[in-house]
């Protein structure tokens, strides 16, 4: 299993997605997991005023992603919350709540996170995969 960060999923919405990321996603598709934390982050992004023009397209895309991964969506549970609390107490400058919650999910399940933002997660000790660097 691999938890996929928002920046990886968002690559799919670009006009010219990075071929390395697309190849990585295709290769690992059966192992990919969608986090409810990522769903919240994507939803937040397209609710912002600057996304008004593309909101309908992003809503359809997110609905499709949720449907495609309905049996591979990771909820945020009490174990995740406990680990999040530990991480939040040690928070480094620049760490945001959603990243820490995603890291907590990965740590609780002992699985890696696929992300481009390796530096944001490295201090948590979570296993990381950067599809841009593979």
What are these regions (language model features)?
Residues 1-38, 47-64:
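Short, well-structured N-terminal submotif of metal-dependent ribonuclease cores
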Residues 49-53, 91, 130-133:
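Short, hinge-like loop/turn segments at secondary-structure boundaries
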Residues 44-46, 68-116:
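Active-site neighborhoods of divalent-metal-dependent phosphate/nucleic-acid chemistry enzymes
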Residues 74-75, 129-131:
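Short acidic-hydrophobic, aromatic-tinged amphipathic segments that line or gate anion-handling sites
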């Amino acid at each position: 299993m691999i938890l996929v960060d928002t920046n990886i999923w968002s690559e799919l919405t670009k006009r010219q997605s990075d071929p390395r990321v697309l190849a990585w996603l295709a290769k690992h598709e059966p192992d990919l997991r969608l986090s409810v934390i990522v769903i919240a982050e994507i939803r937040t992004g397209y609710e912002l005023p600057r996304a008004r023009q593309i909101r309908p397209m992003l809503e359809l895309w997110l609905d499709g992603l949720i449907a495609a991964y309905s049996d591979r969506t990771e909820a945020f549970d009490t174990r995740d919350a406990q680990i999040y609390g530990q991480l939040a107490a040690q928070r480094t400058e620049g760490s945001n709540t959603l990243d820490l919650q995603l890291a907590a999910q990965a740590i609780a399940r002992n699985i890696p996170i696929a992300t481009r933002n390796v530096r944001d997660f490295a201090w948590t000790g979570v296993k990381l995969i950067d599809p841009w660097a593979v």
